[in-house]
Amino acid sequence: MADSSPDSCFKGGKFSAPGFRFHPTDEELVMYYLKRKICRKRLRVNVIGVVDVYKMDPEELPGQSMLKTGDRQWFYFTPRSRKYPNAARSNRGTENGYWKATGKDRVIEYNSRSVGLKKTLVFYRGRAPSGERTDWVMHEYTMDEDELGRCKNPQEYYALYKLFKKSGAGPKNGEQYGAPFQEEEWVDDDNEDVNAIAVAVPEQPVVRYEDARRVDERRLFNPVILQLEDIDELLNGIPNAPGVPQRCIPQVNSEEELQSTLVNNSAREFLPNGQQYNRPSSFDSLETAEVTSAPLVFEKEDFIEMDDLLLIPEFGASSTEKAAQFSNHGEFDDFNEFDQLFHDVSMSLDMEPIDQGTSANLSSLSDSANYTSDQKQQLLYQQFQDQTPENQLNNIMDPSTTLNQITSDIWFEDDQAILFDQQQSFSGAFASPSSGVMPDSTNPTMSVNAQGHEIQNGGGTTSQFSSALWALMDSIPSTPASACEGPLNRTFVRMSSFSRMRFNGKANGTPVSTTIAKKGIRNRGFLLLSIVGALCAIFWVLVATVRVSGRSLLLKD
């Protein structure tokens, strides 16, 4: 049996500090303590003694335990004794009573295999079967036969017992059997610890790394323990070391020595919102091969000049295939989707060149874009006065030409981005659409509505003159009165007008009189059917009334 080592925490049946307790689990009791006892192997701590628990009363057993910690549970190794020589039943009788098995035996498993059996015993004082039950309980741990066969040359068979006393009758689940803490037992702890070994904490030496060549072990630095004398020598030798030569760093003029890659890099005041004068502006990104300088013209915030928005058209076949691109992609990203939809509509229609008689001069349009809104109105008024009376009357009767001339003025009046392609507006005009689509001016439905409106007003000439006059007044550029009159809303109106043209164009080639006649016939037929249905209902009501009255007369007779 192994004894406790001198430096162990368990000495003389006690632990060297409070809180340490012997509280093993069922698996630990069977697989370590009981198995090692049967196989005669060494135990690290001698805490369980060999005692025959059936030869003593329960009150005498705590004094026989090797644990003197004050805990209220004790452990013992007991050789298995037989009640009868050729029987497997143990003799559990004592001098003043007996231990009786109670409850159900529990199997102890380890690694999914059965390694032992746990049995609960209760002590009865007196002779069976009229003994008096006490609060002394004992757990018996035995090893399984298969697990016992794993031991080599077992000499003697033991059973392990755990003894404790309950606080009263009935089950006491969760009851603690540890020793209560007594402060008086640990007051003279320092005086009693005479054999304590003083543990000297070693000082951490200062390690110095010296440069060394590579050796076979492939270590580049060799650690060398540095003593205090060496440190003093090093500190004393520092003032004698040659000093570092003081070198004056020459002063350098950054303007002369440093070269800058920036153009026109000179000290000046930062002025925001600057634009070079007489510089051609375009939405297309430009790649300049040489650097030019020009005076700066400063503008007010949130103001865009007409020159910044105007594009000089380039005639070619590509004008109908790609839309205008902006140089600053982050400035007009919100209008790219609508602009693409507008170009898709223009791509679906055929383009044809504009006649010289009906088209405006391109040079005059580009020059007029440089004028202000007041100058443009004055120019239009002069052009209107210079015309002959016949041309003035034609322009009033057909305001489409006047509207075409001032469309660009309305579109560019607001300080927003251009939402349509100027190349398409200058290079060609919309031709007559294919079958199924007709222009808005040739729509028969619109002509019929216009005729009906003229009849209601009492005269076609006066109504047409007033409508043309109102169209001319509406075309005069002015500040929008509400958000719905902005350029973005007009863009949606123009885009939606194409869908209206296609919808109204489905009635191409169909006379309006035929449609009106069909509607009148349908209305008359519906009215006739309603009258016939009402007459039939009245007839059936009369017939039913006559039948009922006839039956009542027959019953009276």
Swiss-Prot record:
It is found in: Endoplasmic reticulum membrane; Nucleus. Induction: By cold and drought stresses. The chain crosses the membrane at residues 526-546. Residues 115-172 bind DNA. Residues 16-166 form the NAC domain. GO terms for cellular component: endoplasmic reticulum membrane; nucleus. Gene3D superfamilies: NAC domain. Expressed in roots, rosette leaves, cauline leaves, shoot apex, stems and flowers. It is a single-pass membrane protein. One of its GO terms (molecular function) is transcription cis-regulatory region binding. GO terms for biological process: cellular response to hydrogen peroxide; leaf senescence; mitochondria-nucleus signaling pathway; positive regulation of DNA-templated transcription. SUPFAM superfamilies: NAC domain (SSF101941). Keywords: Activator, DNA-binding, Endoplasmic reticulum, Membrane, Nucleus, Stress response, Transcription, Transcription regulation, Transmembrane, Transmembrane helix. The NAC domain includes a DNA binding domain and a dimerization domain. Transcriptional activator activated by proteolytic cleavage through regulated intramembrane proteolysis (RIP). Transcriptional activator that acts as a positive regulator of AOX1A during mitochondrial dysfunction. Binds directly to AOX1A promoter. Mediates mitochondrial retrograde signaling. This is NAC domain-containing protein 17. It comes from Arabidopsis thaliana (Mouse-ear cress).
